[in-house]
C-alpha cells in the first residue's frame, strides 16, 4: 500500500510505501523484492526516477518514504482523456527512455515497465517507480537469471513469455507497449479469453490491434520498431533514443549522462548550513549522507528543505496580482523591495513630501472651522485634510502613529508590531505575522511546572547521551491491523486513505487523527540501533517510562515546534533504516546500551522527613520580645 504522508519537521508531503512484515516473512519473494528495491533506489539517481528518502521499520511493517508526485498516476490521466495527444506522448516516452537508458548504463533492467508505474510530478514530468522486479546482476552480487518469467504479461516481451534467455531489450518492448497505450488508450495485443499461448502467438505474428488514423507515419514507424518480436532486430535503448520521431520539435538540452551521486559543489549550502546551525545536525554527517545518497532521516530533511526552498523561490518570481487579486501582504512586499534600494529612496522622498503638506494643512487657524454654515461644504464633499466634525479629527489624530509607521515604511527597518502579535496594515486590517523564511522553525517556549522540570532532567540526560539522529516510531490503535493504523514515525504522519496516484484537491487531504502518543516509550539503545516497541496499555505510566513524544512530557512541550527537524527530537529507530547495502534485514541479537552518567537524584544523599519535635530551639534569647 502506498499512502500520502506528512513530514512533521519540514511540513512537506511525502509518499509512504507500507509492507506488512507478516506477508514478507511468509513470502520470500516479497522480502527479496523489498531488499532489492531499497538498494537499487539508493544506487540510482535521475530526475525521471523517484527519490528514496528514508527507510523505516516498526514491529509489524516496513516503510519506504519517497518523494511525492502530486500529478498522480499516468493511468488516470489516460483514463480521463481516453488517449493522449501525440506531442504529449512524445514527451513522456522520451523521458521514460532517458530513465531506462540511465538504468541500463548502471546494469539494471527494470522488467516491469507499465503505465501504472509511471507517475507525474508537479511539473508534469515522468517519474518511474517500483524496482521490486528489477535485475541488477553484477552490482549487488545476486540476481534472478535472465530467464525468470516476471512482470505483467500484457507488457512482457515475447522472449520473456517463452522463458527464453533475454536481456535489457525486454524494457524496449515494454516502452513500445506504453507508447501504444498512450496514443490509443488500449493495449496492442489482447486475446479473449486470456491465454498466454495465444498472446505469445499474436506477438510473434505481429498481429497488433488496429491503429487510429490520426497517428502520424513517423510515430507508427517508431512504434513498430519498438514492438519488434525478434530481439536481434529490436533496437537497444540508445538506438531507440536516437529515433527521429522522438527528437522532432525537441528544444531541450542534448543528451548527457546524469551522475548517480551529488557532487560537493552541487550541494545547497544554505540548506546544509541551516541543518547544521539551526537543526543541530553535524556538518560532516550531513555531507557524507548526501554524497552517498544513503536513505535516512538526514537525507529526507535535506531533500525536503531543498525542495521547499525551490518552491519558495519560484513563488517569489510570480506576479503579485493575479486576476486583480493581491495574494501577498505588505510584509511580503517589504521583503521584496529590499532588493531594490533606488525604488525605496523614491518612495521615501514622496512620503516625506506628503507629510509636509499634511502638516501645513493642520497649521490652518481653527477660525475657519467656526465660519457660518452657508460657507461650509457638505460633509460628503469635505476634503480629507479639512474635516468639519471633531470626531474625525480625533480619529485622524489617533491614527497618526499608523500613518507614520506605514507612510514611510522602510524595508531596512523593523515593522511596528502591536501587542496582540499582529502588525498594522495600510488597509486598517490586522495581518498575522509570518516568517519570511519558511525553513526556519519558530521556537515557542512554554513555562512548565517545577514537577515537570525534574522529570525533564532525567529525560534530557538520556536524550543527550544517545543523541539519535533519526526519527521516532508509530503507535498503533488496532493491533489486529497494524498496517491500517501504523505510522512509520512521529516525524511522518499518514494522511488519508491509500493513494491511488490520482490528483486530488488540497482540501480533500486531511490529517487522520490516528495517533496515540501516550503509549510509546523510548528504548535505551545504541544511537545506531533502536527498535520500535509498544508498551502495554494496561501498565500505569510513571515519570521514568513517560514517552518524550507524549503531550504530557515536559521535554516535548518545551521545544514542540522549535526542534522538530533536529536530531535531538529523535527517540528511536528501527534496525532497517540504518542499513548498508546487503544489511537491510540482518538480524541483530544484542542491543548495546551506553553507560551514561548517573542521574543527579541517584548521587544525592537520601532525604528524611523531619517531625515537628525533631529540631530543638533555644527560646531563652527570645524571652521578652513576644
Swiss-Prot record:
<keyword id="KW-0067">ATP-binding</keyword>
<feature type="compositionally biased region" description="Low complexity">
    <location>
        <begin position="539"/>
        <end position="555"/>
    </location>
</feature>
<keyword id="KW-0418">Kinase</keyword>
<keyword id="KW-0808">Transferase</keyword>
<protein>
    <recommendedName>
        <fullName>Hormonally up-regulated neu tumor-associated kinase homolog B</fullName>
        <ecNumber>2.7.11.1</ecNumber>
    </recommendedName>
</protein>
<dbReference type="GO" id="GO:0005524">
    <property type="term" value="F:ATP binding"/>
</dbReference>
<feature type="compositionally biased region" description="Polar residues">
    <location>
        <begin position="374"/>
        <end position="390"/>
    </location>
</feature>
<keyword id="KW-0723">Serine/threonine-protein kinase</keyword>
<dbReference type="GO" id="GO:0035556">
    <property type="term" value="P:intracellular signal transduction"/>
</dbReference>
<dbReference type="GO" id="GO:0004674">
    <property type="term" value="F:protein serine/threonine kinase activity"/>
</dbReference>
<feature type="compositionally biased region" description="Basic and acidic residues">
    <location>
        <begin position="392"/>
        <end position="405"/>
    </location>
</feature>
<dbReference type="GO" id="GO:0106310">
    <property type="term" value="F:protein serine kinase activity"/>
</dbReference>
<feature type="region of interest" description="Disordered">
    <location>
        <begin position="590"/>
        <end position="615"/>
    </location>
</feature>
<dbReference type="InterPro" id="IPR000719">
    <property type="entry name" value="Prot_kinase_dom"/>
</dbReference>
<feature type="binding site">
    <location>
        <begin position="1"/>
        <end position="2"/>
    </location>
    <ligand>
        <name>ATP</name>
    </ligand>
</feature>
<feature type="compositionally biased region" description="Polar residues">
    <location>
        <begin position="556"/>
        <end position="566"/>
    </location>
</feature>
<feature type="domain" description="Protein kinase">
    <location>
        <begin position="1"/>
        <end position="246"/>
    </location>
</feature>
<feature type="compositionally biased region" description="Basic and acidic residues">
    <location>
        <begin position="336"/>
        <end position="357"/>
    </location>
</feature>
<dbReference type="GO" id="GO:0005737">
    <property type="term" value="C:cytoplasm"/>
</dbReference>
<feature type="region of interest" description="Disordered">
    <location>
        <begin position="336"/>
        <end position="407"/>
    </location>
</feature>
<feature type="active site" description="Proton acceptor">
    <location>
        <position position="112"/>
    </location>
</feature>
<dbReference type="InterPro" id="IPR008271">
    <property type="entry name" value="Ser/Thr_kinase_AS"/>
</dbReference>
<feature type="compositionally biased region" description="Polar residues">
    <location>
        <begin position="518"/>
        <end position="532"/>
    </location>
</feature>
<feature type="region of interest" description="Disordered">
    <location>
        <begin position="477"/>
        <end position="574"/>
    </location>
</feature>
<keyword id="KW-0547">Nucleotide-binding</keyword>
<dbReference type="Pfam" id="PF00069">
    <property type="entry name" value="Pkinase"/>
</dbReference>
<comment type="similarity">
    <text>Belongs to the protein kinase superfamily. CAMK Ser/Thr protein kinase family. SNF1 subfamily.</text>
</comment>
<dbReference type="InterPro" id="IPR011009">
    <property type="entry name" value="Kinase-like_dom_sf"/>
</dbReference>
<feature type="binding site">
    <location>
        <position position="17"/>
    </location>
    <ligand>
        <name>ATP</name>
    </ligand>
</feature>
Amino acid at each position: 500500500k502506498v499512502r500520502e504522508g506528512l513530514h512533521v519537521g519540514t511540513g512537506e508531503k511525502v509518499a509512504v510505501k507500507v509492507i506488512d512484515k507478516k506477508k514478507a516473512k511468509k513470502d520470500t519473494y516479497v522480502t527479496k523484492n523489498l531488499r532489492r528495491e531499497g538498494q537499487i533506489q539508493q544506487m540510482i539517481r535521475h530526475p525521471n526516477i523517484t527519490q528514496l528518502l528514508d527507510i523505516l521499520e516498526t514491529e509489524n511493517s516496513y516503510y519506504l518514504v519517497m518523494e511525492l508526485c502530486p500529478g498522480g498516476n499516468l493511468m488516470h490521466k489516460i483514463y480521463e482523456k481516453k488517449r493522449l495527444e501525440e506531442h504529449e506522448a512524445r514527451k513522456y516516452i522520451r523521458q521514460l527512455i532517458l530513465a531506462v537508458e540511465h538504468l541500463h548504463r548502471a546494469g539494471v533492467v527494470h522488467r516491469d515497465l507499465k503505465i501504472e508505474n509511471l507517475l507525474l510530478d508537479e511539473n508534469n514530468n515522468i517519474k518511474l517507480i517500483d524496482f521490486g522486479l528489477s535485475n541488477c546482476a553484477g552490482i549487488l552480487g545476486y540476481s534472478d537469471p535472465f530467464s525468470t518469467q516476471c512482470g505483467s504479461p500484457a507488457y512482457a516481451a515475447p522472449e520473456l513469455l517463452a522463458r527464453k534467455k533475454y536481456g535489457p531489450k525486454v524494457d524496449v518492448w515494454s516502452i513500445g507497449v506504453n507508447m501504444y497505450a498512450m496514443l490509443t488508450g488500449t493495449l496492442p495485443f489482447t486475446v479473449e479469453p486470456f491465454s498466454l499461448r495465444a498472446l505469445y502467438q499474436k506477438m510473434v505474428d505481429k498481429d497488433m490491434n488496429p491503429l487510429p488514423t490520426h497517428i502520424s507515419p513517423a510515430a507508427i514507424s517508431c512504434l513498430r520498431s519498438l514492438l519488434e518480436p525478434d530481439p536481434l532486430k529490436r533496437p537497444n535503448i540508445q538506438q531507440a533514443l536516437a529515433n527521429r520521431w522522438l527528437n522532432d520539435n525537441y528544444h531541450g538540452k542534448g543528451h548527457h549522462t546524469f551522475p548517480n551521486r551529488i557532487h560537493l559543489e552541487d550541494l545547497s549550502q544554505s540548506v546544509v548550513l541551516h541543518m547544521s546551525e539551526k537543526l543541530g545536525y553535524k556538518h560532516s554527517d550531513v555531507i557524507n549522507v548526501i554524497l552517498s545518497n544513503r536513505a535516512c532521516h538526514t537525507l529526507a530533511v535535506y531533500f525536503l528543505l531543498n525542495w521547499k526552498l525551490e518552491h519558495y523561490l519560484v513563488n517569489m518570481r510570480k506576479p503579485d496580482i493575479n486576476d486583480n487579486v493581491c495574494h501577498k501582504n505588505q510584509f511580503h512586499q517589504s521583503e521584496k523591495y529590499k532588493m531594490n534600494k533606488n525604488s525605496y529612496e523614491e518612495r521615501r522622498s514622496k512620503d516625506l513630501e506628503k507629510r509636509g503638506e499634511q502638516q501645513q494643512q493642520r497649521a490652518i487657524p481653527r477660525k475657519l472651522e467656526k465660519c457660518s454654515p452657508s460657507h461650509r461644504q457638505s460633509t460628503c464633499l469635505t476634503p480629507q485634510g479639512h474635516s468639519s466634525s471633531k470626531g474625525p479629527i480625533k480619529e485622524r489624530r489617533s491614527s497618526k502613529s499608523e500613518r507614520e509607521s506605514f507612510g514611510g515604511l522602510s524595508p531596512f527597518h523593523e515593522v511596528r508590531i502591536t501587542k496582540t502579535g499582529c502588525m498594522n496594515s495600510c488597509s486598517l486590517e490586522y495581518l498575522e505575522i509570518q516568517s519570511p523564511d519558511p525553513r526556519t522553525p519558530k521556537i515557542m517556549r512554554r513555562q512548565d511546572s517545577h514537577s515537570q522540570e525534574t522529570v525533564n532532567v532525567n529525560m534530557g540526560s538520556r536524550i543527550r547521551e544517545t543523541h539519535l539522529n533519526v526519527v521516532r516510531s508509530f503507535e498503533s490503535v488496532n493491533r489486529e491491523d497494524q498496517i491500517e493504523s501504523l505510522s512509520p514515525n512521529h516525524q511522518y504522519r499518514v494522511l488519508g486513505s491509500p493513494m491511488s496516484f490520482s490528483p486530488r484537491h488540497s482540501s480533500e487531504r486531511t490529517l487522520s487523527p490516528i495517533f496515540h502518543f501516550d503509549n510509546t516509550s523510548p528504548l535505551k539503545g545504541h544511537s545506531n540501533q533502536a527498535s520500535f516497541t509498544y508498551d502495554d496499555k494496561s501498565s500505569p505510566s510513571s515519570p521514568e517510562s513517560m514517552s518524550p513524544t507524549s503531550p504530557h512530557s515536559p521535554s516535548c512541550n518545551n521545544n514542540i515546534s522549535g526542534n522538530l527537524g533536529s536530531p535531538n527530537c529523535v527517540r528511536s529507530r528501527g534496525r532497517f533504516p540504518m542499513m548498508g547495502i546487503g544489511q537491510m534485514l540482518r538480524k541483530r541479537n544484542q542491543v548495546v546500551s551506553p553507560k551514561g552518567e548517573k542521574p543527579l537524584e541517584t548521587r544525592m544523599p537520601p532525604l528524611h522527613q523531619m517531625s515537628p519535635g525533631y529540631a530543638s530551639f533555644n527560646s531563652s534569647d527570645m524571652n521578652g520580645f513576644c
